[in-house]
């Protein structure tokens, strides 16, 4: 979603919210939470507040009128009723006829509510320097996490990684073969964005940055002489990220055509641009996701930008056998997250031995 559209949707949701949610939103901007995260949280709050009114827990006529006391006195039984509602509600905007949302969605909803309750009961200060209230019902609500061993997760992910020679084969496929299957109209669009698309894919495969980090990259953040990019990690931490050398020609080719092809001016700071009717804009996450899905599905299997991040991490661990190095490359504070890649690499080694 384009940043401008995202901010518009956030403003629409803010108009519906009670004053204490608006305070929460303003507070989290200073952390900073990303606008994408805050947008998703606001959507969860809207769903929760709508349920409070529809279920009769609150007598308010509109969401903005739900008093703080409703949240303060909400019982564990009330919250469990809300969770049950999520499990049983009919899914909207989908061909899937099953009832209820997934456990992952429920966990995301509860995470958003936990963040709001923590703010109201611990972080905010009233005129006396105290939080608005102390009772946090979310601490009494347990979440059910998806049970899956690292080995099982590694097996599921492994099939969606472009390991070994497949990393360069994927880039070469997009560069040299993909266009032969296209109609004249599709070919024109492909050729306009070919250098940019290749640069994005190469950067993701060569650095392992998150999609949001690639989207928010500015021209000034890219140093091709040192093959380093400056990114803002989760939690607002700034980081310098090394980029593998194989991405350099793709990035150089894109920079060569960026200004002329996308009508970029000095005021257009974004590194990856799209252009519509002569107006350049920062390329949004949704467009990159669709682009990666399109090329990868035609090459081998449909994947997400996050799978390209997993690809880099797995290849780096395979080459170095260092979880510390991989965690630093990915911007993780702990090596625990990188345990997954040891399982993937070990499976690859076992497969190689079986062929001897």
UniProtKB/Swiss-Prot annotation:
It is found in: Cytoplasm. One of its GO terms (molecular function) is tyrosine-based site-specific recombinase activity. FtsK is required for recombination. One of its GO terms (cellular component) is cytoplasm. Residues 169-354 form the Tyr recombinase domain. The active site is at residues 210, 234, 306, 309, 332, 341. One of its GO terms (biological process) is chromosome segregation. Keywords: Cell cycle, Cell division, Chromosome partition, Cytoplasm, DNA integration, DNA recombination, DNA-binding. Pfam families: Phage_int_SAM_1, Phage_integrase. Residues 16-121 form the Core-binding (CB) domain. PROSITE patterns: CB, TYR_RECOMBINASE. It comes from the Bacteria. Site-specific tyrosine recombinase, which acts by catalyzing the cutting and rejoining of the recombining DNA molecules. Essential to convert dimers of the bacterial chromosome into monomers to permit their segregation at cell division. NCBIfam families: PRK05084.1. Belongs to the 'phage' integrase family. XerS subfamily. This is Tyrosine recombinase XerS. The gene is xerS.
